[in-house]
C-alpha cells in the first residue's frame, strides 16, 4: 500500500483536433492552471492531425514541455484509420495483413514517444471481423506475433506498451476483460507490455472496479479516468472511490489520465472538475486506509 499522491494527466485529443494540433499551447496552459502533472497526446496520423507534420508536432511538444514543466504521460496510438474497417489502412491485431499495418504504425509512435520522452504507448486491441470459437486460436496467434514485434521494437527504444482493455461494442468480442488481457500478455512472453484500464470501457465488461484493479496488478501501468457516460469523472456512476482504494493498496505509481468526450459543459470545466473530484476522493481514500480510520486516532501499545 502507498500513500504517494496520485499523478494526473489529461488526454489532449478529447479537447478536439483544432486545439490538439493547431493550438496545443492552449492545452498546456489549461493543464498547468489546474495542477496537472502531464499530458497524453496522439501523434498526427491518418484522420488525425489536420495536416500538421509529425516532425513539427514533435518539436512543438518538446518546447511546450519545457515552457510549462509538464511531462508526457503516454502516446495514445489511435492508428489513424482504425475506426473505419473499409479503409485500406485499417489496422487490427487479429488478421495478418492488418496486423502488419498495426505493427508499422505502432513503431512510428514508439519513435515519437522516445523522442518526446513518453514512457508508454497505448495499443488498442481492434478486430476486423467477429471472432468465434472457430477463429480464436488463429486470431490469438496473430495478435501475439504482432505484440511481440511491437514490444521488441519498443524495448530497443526504452518504451513500454500498454494494451487498452476496450468494450465489445466498440472493438468487438475478443479480449475485453483484464483477465484476458493478462492472458494475452502472458502468451507474448514480453516484460514491457502492461495494461491500460479505461473506466468507461471497464464499466461494460468488469464485474467490479475494485476487483478489476486488483486483477490487473502488477501489470496495471496506465489508466483512463472517464465515467460510465464517457464524461469527466463524477458525471456518471463508476465507483471511483473503490478504484482509488484499490490503486492505493497495490502501490500504483502510473498516471491517472482524465478523459471526457464530449466536453461537458466546456473544456475548462471538464479539466477543472475532473481533477478536483478525484483529488477529493483521494483525500477520503487516504483517510479510509489510514490506521486512524474511523475513530480519528490509531491504536498504540
Spans of model-derived segments:
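A short acidic, helix-capping loop that chelates divalent metal ions and anchors anionic groups
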Residues: 47-49, 83-86, 129-134, 169-171, ...
Amino acid at each position: 500500500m502507498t500513500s504517494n499522491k496520485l499523478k494526473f494527466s489529461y488526454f489532449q485529443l478529447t479537447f478536439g483536433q483544432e486545439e490538439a494540433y493547431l493550438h496545443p499551447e492552449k492545452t498546456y496552459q489549461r493543464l498547468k492552471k489546474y495542477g496537472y502533472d502531464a499530458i497524453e497526446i496522439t501523434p498526427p496520423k491518418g484522420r488525425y492531425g489536420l495536416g500538421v507534420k509529425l516532425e513539427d508536432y514533435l518539436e512543438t511538444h518538446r518546447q511546450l514541455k519545457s515552457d510549462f514543466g509538464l511531462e508526457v504521460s503516454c502516446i495514445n496510438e489511435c492508428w489513424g484509420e482504425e475506426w473505419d474497417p473499409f479503409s485500406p489502412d485499417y489496422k487490427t491485431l487479429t488478421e495478418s495483413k492488418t496486423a502488419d499495418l498495426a505493427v508499422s504504425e505502432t513503431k512510428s509512435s514508439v519513435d515519437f514517444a522516445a523522442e518526446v520522452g513518453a514512457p508508454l504507448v497505448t495499443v488498442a486491441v481492434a478486430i476486423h471481423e467477429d471472432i468465434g470459437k472457430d477463429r480464436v486460436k488463429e486470431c490469438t496467434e496473430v495478435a501475439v506475433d504482432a505484440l511481440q514485434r511491437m514490444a521488441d521494437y519498443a524495448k530497443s527504444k526504452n518504451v513500454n506498451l500498454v494494451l487498452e482493455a476496450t468494450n465489445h461494442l466498440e472493438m468487438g468480442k475478443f479480449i475485453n476483460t483484464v483477465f484476458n488481457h493478462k492472458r494475452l500478455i502472458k502468451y507474448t512472453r514480453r516484460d514491457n507490455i502492461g495494461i491500460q484500464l479505461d473506466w468507461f470501457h471497464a464499466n461494460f465488461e468488469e464485474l467490479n472496479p475494485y476487483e478489476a484493479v486488483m486483477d490487473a496488478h502488477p501489470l496495471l501501468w496506465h489508466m483512463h479516468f472517464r465515467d460510465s457516460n464517457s464524461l469527466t469523472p463524477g458525471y456518471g456512476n463508476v465507483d471511483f472511490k473503490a478504484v482509488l482504494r484499490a490503486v492505493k493498496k497495490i502501490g500504483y505509481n502510473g498516471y491517472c489520465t482524465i478523459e471526457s468526450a464530449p466536453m461537458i459543459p466546456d473544456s475548462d470545466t471538464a479539466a477543472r472538475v475532473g481533477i478536483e473530484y478525484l483529488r477529493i476522493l483521494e483525500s477520503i481514500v487516504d483517510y479510509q486506509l489510514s490506521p486512524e480510520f474511523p475513530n480519528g486516532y490509531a491504536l498504540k501499545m
